[in-house]
Structure formats: C-alpha cells, structure tokens
Regions:
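Acidic, glycine/proline-rich Ca2+-coordinating loop motifs
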Residues: 1-275
Length: 275
C-alpha cells in the first residue's frame, strides 16, 4: 500500500515541467539517496538532496553551474573512481557540422537572461556531465570529456560495458519526426502559417506532419579510458545501427559476467546486444 507524499516531501509537481528522466544515488556521502530529475523544454532540472526525515531540499541552482536545456535521459555513477558519483544528462546538440547548421536554433541573449532571472537557471543545449567534488557540488565537464554532442539523445546509461573497471556511457539516439529541421520550418511550416488564416478549408494535420523529415541516428558508446577521457566506440563494438532509439537498459542476461544491452526503437524492432 502506497501513500502519495509528494508535496510534504518537498518534491515539485510543476505544471510546466516535462520530466523525462530520474536518477537516484547518494550524491553527498551521507548514506541517504538523493534525486536528480531531468526536465525537457524550458524548465530547468531538479536536484533533490535527501534530508533524512522524509524531506527533500531542491538545491540545483546552488550546486550545479548550469544544466542541459532539453534534458531527457539521466544517470548517476562514479566515472573517475574517486568514490563520488557524477551526473550525466542527454540533450540534442549534433555531433557534426551539417546537422548543427541545419537543425539547431539557439535563444538570443535577452531571452536567456530573462529565463535566468525567472529562476530557470543557466541552461545550455548539450549533454552535461557534472563532476562531483565529493560534497554534491558539481562542475560541468561534458565538452572537455568529449561526451557533450550526440544529437537527438534520449536514454543515458552509465555502466562498465568493457569490464575494465571504468564505467562507460551509452546514449540512445534518433527522432521519428525531426521538428528542429530548419528546412522544414523555412520552406514548409512558414508557408502553412501564411496560408492557413485565410483558408476556408479544414487543415490536414496528418498531411502536414508527413512533411516533417525523419532522422535515423547512430547510438553512442563512450569508452572510458580513465581520467575522464572518453571516445565513441559504437562502430567497433557493433552498436552503430541507425535507428529511432529511445529507452535502453542493461543487465547480464546470459550470466556470463558482463553486461548485455537492450535498446527500444520507435516503430521498429528493439535491439538486443549480447556482450
């Protein structure tokens, strides 16, 4: 039997939050599980520190210098083997210049400043890797570590898929309808917005949606070489099939001592990878 204690525990139930991920771990070494919530769109992420009395305190602005703008997946694990867990979140920054130029639009400075002053905190469109200093205060090092840009990313998994003692990062990618396509916005959506107000005919949304481009993307498998140095080994590991991947999970499915991987795909069969 369960009782809903969300409000009394200090957990937000915001009408504007698009919560897509949650990760649980003891971030500050007090033997109490803390929570990290990844929120899509304009709402910032939430970091809840467990106070040990059934209460949580949301402290992201004072502990994280900035977070992903459109956070989707999230996971927590110790990536540098210092005993303190890091936080990793996924976003939508493309990893190549072509996709960067044709799919991304960034907010102007005055809008970013307005969001910050309205308590949305500093946000950046990239995967974020928050390095823990041992007291649950974090420095964002995603770009430095080479894990910031994986395109339209969903699932985030941190686990040792190489069995070398260093935890690695798996990111699932893909978007069935690439609504960020600048060509779609400039040459199709804008024309529809111009014509629709004067039209006396019923608008065909299904036809409109069919014009949105689809984008199969490669999943990423970042090998951890130690000292927070990562490289994408998806191709050499057999994990680079183009897909519309979102959810993913790992586990030793054949009891051979290493972790296998299951990846869900939209409108396509899932992937089952034996390690």
């Amino acid at each position: 039997t369960f009782t809903d204690v969300t409000a009394e525990a200090g957990i937000y139930s915001s009408d504007i939050a698009f919560g897509l991920g949650v990760a649980v771990s003891d971030l500050n070494g007090d033997n109490l599980p803390d929570l990290y919530i990844s929120n899509d769109f304009w709402e910032r992420d939430y970091l809840y520190i467990n106070k040990g009395n059934g209460k949580f305190s949301e402290e992201l602005p004072s502990r994280v210098n900035y977070c992903s703008t459109s956070s989707m997946g999230a996971d927590i694990a110790d990536l540098n083997n210092d005993g303190y867990p890091e936080v990793f979140t996924t976003d939508m920054l493309p990893g190549d210049n072509y996709r960067l130029q044709t799919t991304m639009a960034f907010d102007p400075y005055h809008l970013e400043d307005a969001k910050y002053r309205a308590n949305y905190h500093y946000q950046i469109t990239q995967n974020c890797l928050h390095l823990n200093d041992g007291t649950a205060n974090f420095s964002e090092v995603g770009l430095m570590c080479g894990v910031a840009a994986t395109d339209w990313s969903w699932g985030a998994l941190i686990f040792d898929f190489e069995n070398d003692g260093n935890k690695d990062i798996f990111v699932s990618n893909g978007i069935l309808k690439d609504i960020m396509s600048m060509d779609f916005h400039d040459f199709i959506a804008d024309q529809v917005r111009i014509r629709t107000p004067g039209s006396k005919h019923r608008f065909d949304y299904l036809k409109f949606i069919s014009n949105i481009p689809t984008e199969h993307l490669q999943n990423y498998a970042f090998s951890n070489a130690g000292n927070l140095k990562f490289s994408n080994r998806a191709t050499s590991l057999g994990l680079s099939q183009l897909s519309y991947s979102n959810g993913a999970a790992y586990g030793d499915l054949d009891n051979d001592g290493d972790e296998d991987l299951v990846v869900n795909n939209i409108n396509e069969k899932c992937f089952l990878y034996r390690n």
